[in-house]
Amino acid sequence: MERIKGFISTVRLMVMALFLRLKAGSWDKVVFHGKVTFEHWRDGQLLYTETGTNTFTTEGMAKLLNIIFHDISKAASHIWYVGIFKNNITPALADTGAKLGSGNAYGECQDADYDSPLTNRPAYTTEDTTTAVITNVNAKAHFVMNASITVYGAFLADAAAKTAATGTLMCAKRFGTPRAVIADDEIYVTYQITCTTS
């Protein structure tokens, strides 16, 4: 009888452990994955392309949560912009918009570095989605270079001006291979953001 009770106790513990494991299963999580594709063109020829994951900042994730679940409204027009940077820096979770702009940690590229578009960063132009993926693949961020520099990476921020060191840095990516560009080279950046439960 004691052996049967012990067996039943063991089974009960196993069932409870399984229940707790299932309760904490992958479907109760929401994870954002950022995939960045970088293209470097010269004279109409694709010189280099790479795709990799980026770092979502704490500041950026807080912005998402506040728009979705709190009281921060989202602009009716573009809210995110793509920028590129020329300092040898690896994006970190604690990075903020204060590291962008002219002369700050990221060394954001300015009009002297790329002159199309002038003044402002290109908009992150997406389309309505009915899936868990949003991307600017049909309207890639396009930069026409104006100088011989090395481009180290790209980012998403919510301020339009290249000089802006305010607002939110959503995410950033240091390229696996920094690119030495010259005047009239073209850079295209595609950001794909996936929301998943795993």
Model-derived features: where do they sit?
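Small cysteine-rich, disulfide-bonded extracellular modules of the LU/uPAR three-finger superfamily
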Residues: 1-152, 158-198
